[in-house]
């Protein structure tokens, strides 16, 4: 029986970018950092130009004849490429429906946990299906379940909008929330700063000259 292959615990070898001394072609077509064509020059000269500009010589088209290199800040270029890749991945995110389950008699701690789960799903761009599960005779308390779901929608109003209002589905009551596209602007009176009444104290009238003269005679 042949020996079983050993599990290779080593990290996979990453392919290193073709920049600077890792470029092994003797002749290169070089494009300067500002887009100027420097023409076909030998490798050593191209490296010297990049070094004088304190930049990198990067191979951008290996299949061309001769291969094409560009002088650039490779660190900045790599950062911008990774940023673009993340943005493209974010835009291509497929919306999923995540479910949050609970009972209508849920305690405050468990309710807070469900709220936290829903917030994470919504921030990831997914819809949330909120489900209240009934068991046995609990089906009689659909009104309490609806109240719970509407409370949940209220607590999540900054992150979500109601896509489907609470409704009974079999032995469950469900509600669908979708990520809010526009920020919520609160206009209720609770967010307004109350204006306190200020008591105005009227200063006493100033004494006239005649009154002052009479007062001096009396004294």
UniProtKB/Swiss-Prot annotation:
The keyword Plastid does not apply. It is found in: Cytoplasm. The gene is infC. GO terms for cellular component: cytosol; membrane. The lineage of its organism: Bacteria, Bacillati, Cyanobacteriota, Cyanophyceae, Synechococcales. NCBIfam families: infC. Pfam families: IF3_C, IF3_N. IF-3 binds to the 30S ribosomal subunit and shifts the equilibrium between 70S ribosomes and their 50S and 30S subunits in favor of the free subunits, thus enhancing the availability of 30S subunits on which protein synthesis initiation begins. The keyword Cytoplasm applies. It comes from the Bacteria. Signal peptide: none annotated. Gene3D superfamilies: Translation initiation factor 3 (IF-3), C-terminal domain, Translation initiation factor 3 (IF-3), N-terminal domain. InterPro entries: T_IF-3_C_sf, T_IF-3_N_sf, Translation_initiation_fac3_CS, Translation_initiation_fac_3, Translation_initiation_fac_3_C, Translation_initiation_fac_3_N. One of its GO terms (biological process) is ribosome disassembly. PROSITE patterns: IF3. Keywords: Cytoplasm, Initiation factor, Protein biosynthesis. Monomer. One of its GO terms (molecular function) is ribosome binding. Belongs to the IF-3 family. This is Translation initiation factor IF-3. Its main location: cytoplasm.
């Amino acid at each position: 029986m042949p020996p079983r292959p050993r599990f290779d615990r080593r990290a996979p070898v990453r392919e290193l970018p073709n920049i600077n001394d890792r470029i092994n072609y003797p002749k290169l077509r070089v494009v300067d950092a500002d887009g100027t064509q420097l023409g076909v020059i030998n490798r050593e000269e191209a490296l010297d130009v990049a070094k004088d500009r304190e930049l990198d010589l990067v191979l951008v088209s290996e299949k061309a004849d001769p291969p094409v290199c560009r002088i650039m800040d490779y660190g900045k270029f790599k950062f911008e490429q990774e940023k673009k890749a993340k943005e493209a991945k974010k835009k291509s995110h497929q919306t999923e429906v995540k479910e949050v389950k609970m009972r209508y008699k849920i305690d405050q701690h468990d309710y807070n946990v469900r709220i936290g789960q829903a917030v994470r799903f919504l921030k990831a761009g997914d819809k949330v299906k909120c489900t209240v599960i009934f068991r046995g005779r609990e089906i009689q308390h659909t009104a309490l379940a609806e109240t719970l779901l509407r409370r949940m929608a209220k607590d999540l109003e900054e992150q979500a909008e109601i896509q489907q209002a609470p409704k009974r589905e079999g032995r469950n009551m469900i509600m669908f929330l979708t990520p809010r596209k526009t920020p919520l602007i609160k206009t209720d009176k609770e967010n307004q700063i109350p204006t306190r009444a200020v008591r105005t104290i009227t200063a006493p009238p100033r004494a006239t000259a005649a009154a002052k003269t009479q007062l001096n005679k009396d004294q």
